[in-house]
């Protein structure tokens, strides 16, 4: 590889990982289609045992978010048929919290060498890659799961099959507020060299 001896191509990426955070409040604009297409393609470069490609993703933006909101309302009414208008409207608005939503779906294949948890992790890696790339381009995202990820009305409305599972809703847009201070994390709380010395 021919590069300047002073160059450190990994530095910026490591800095981005260290600065990444979730942005629960997002607004327009979302990244344009050209940028999104590049991000989506690159995000697929993850560990994928036996090349099962155990994932698919739904991109929901614009007025289509209202249809997702309708599914959230169906879930609300299924749990409480007497839910009032205010409760239903609150559920509906949750689909409008960002200009773009990527629904990450694990598509499980029965394979003797690749358990479902490994396939789920691979799908999660793609979602995480998308979030990192979004942040590196000056936008923000937040990964949500919650009851809608396992809701029958939502899963059926989004066309999930019996071998599929929603792993997250990645909300994407422009952060509405400036960066919040990053909470300190101590590496040594989670990483230990083995064997441990007594």
Per-segment meaning from a language model:
Residues 43, 102, 108-156:
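Small-aliphatic-rich amphipathic alpha-helix that forms the alpha element of a beta-alpha
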Residues 100, 108-112, 191-198:
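Helix-biased detector of long, well-ordered alpha-helical tracts
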Residues 97-103:
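A structural motif
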Residues 2-9, 15-16, 166-198:
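C-terminal helix-cap and adjacent tail motif
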Residues 154-167:
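Short, electropositive alpha-helical surface patch
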Residues 1-97, 196-198:
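N-terminal amphipathic, basic helical "cap/leader" segment at the start of enzyme domains
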